[in-house]
Amino acid sequence: MSATQKGMFVDTSICTGCKACQVACKEWNELPMEDQAAVHLGNAFLAESYDNTGHLSATNWRHVKFMEQFPDDRTQTQGRWLMMSDSCKHCVQAGCLEVCPTGALFRTDFGAVDIHNDVCIGCRYCVGACPFGVISFNDKYDSNEGGPHMVKGTVNKCVLCSDRVANGLGTACAKACPTSSITFGNLDDLKRLAASRVQALHTRGQTDAYVYGWDLKAEGFDRPSTGAQDLKVVGGLNVFYLLLDKPHVYGLPDRDPGLPQKNILPNAGGALLMAGVLGVAGVAAFRKRRMDAAGAAE
């Protein structure tokens, strides 16, 4: 890949949960409205939470998570809200790419993981291979009902606005973010920005701030050696985060999940072959018992 690698840095410490990024993603990609029954929210948005989408899906490529850390009595002077704008991480070592049997998932020149929906056969191996639960199967919408990205029977996810990036534009979500919590740019520049943000927060006493996706010190960037330390996963994330609590609080793996087996088809074939052998053996044993029983009756 000769082109400059692009990505996004998501600084959760300045996310206000406004959801402008969610709206911008929906509008630019012409995604259909999320089915509230499908995300099992019911009236939760009106009652206990500001989270109105629940999770990422085939029609919801960006989701603002709300982590409400308050005691049971909801004392205003205690606790905090943590918020994170979540999407595909466009992993350097992408499990979805490893297991896709058709090449429907592919790497762009800028480092994003994109999808050829006309090549996708809907096998859903990538869904299980993604350690972040990003990829979803679309079994409801086609392009007439759900917009140009919707091909019924295929998978969908954030594609890092590959059409915009190819034309020299940033991502729609980053452009819409009013606080610069989401920043699009060259990957090295974003790492430098992330290191400066971690340094600034630690200087102010917020030593729980760290980067999820890269080890900035190992990458040669200056950041504090004390306090919370960065975590590099799956070879690095082209969309990476500044977090203020443990990864699992944000619904992320606490450890590097690594790559899935590169080709799961031989294993699947072996399982089918074994099932066939056992089936034939079972039929043969059943027939033998019937013949023995018939002989005894005579």
For the regions a language model picked out, list residue spans one by one:
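Non-ligating segments of multi-cofactor redox enzymes
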Residues: 1-298
